[in-house]
Amino acid sequence: PDYEVIGRTMAELIFSHIPSFGSVVLCAGNPKWEQHARIVQGFEDYMQENGAQNRIYLDNSCCIGSEAQRNILKPDVAACCSVLSQGSVMLVQGLQQCGKAGKVFAVGSDVFEENLDALRNRILDNIVQKNPYAQGYLGIKALVEYLVQGKAPEQRTIYVGSEVVFRSNAVMYDRDNFRGLLL
């Protein structure tokens, strides 16, 4: 996927739902990992290009610690999101522990059962699905075509589209339906 576009999408979702003075907790993952850093960059680029002056509390931790809880509990926090699937689990736990579940706009990353449950239970408002299965499938397909047929990929980078999941379309991502979206 184009990770910067994913960051922009997350930012657009959030800033279309919160006031201009509301702060955002951004579970940013590991800044040394290119995917995480590019999502954060896209988020920041969207803010700059659209004149958003909202304060961002950046959290690079891998578990819900006291710093993350302090950020979530700040009275100015109107939204939160995570750039990685593990961070989404952490974020949901933090929102529940702090009593903020359903009170701030929250966006998670990737579709898996825990995130779908959080969406259905109104802890998460949206999930950005980065399609990891499709990423793996297309990567292996390109490799097999190269090794077996000698056919090099047409482009150096293969982009996989991302999708925004709402409660209204979550049924498409239920266990029985989800695999069918890959084909």
Place the predicted regions along the sequence by residue.
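Hydrophobic alpha-helical segments within soluble ligand-binding/sensing domains
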Residues: 1-25, 65-69, 111-115, 131-148
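Short, solvent-exposed amphipathic alpha-helices that sit
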Residues: 6-10, 34-53, 68, 90-94, ...
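Short beta-strand->loop
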Residues: 25-34, 58-59
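Hydrophobic alpha-helical
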Residues: 43, 56-118
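Hinge/cleft segment of the Venus flytrap/periplasmic-binding protein
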Residues: 47, 131-183
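Conserved phosphoryl-transfer motifs of two-component systems
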Residues: 125-126
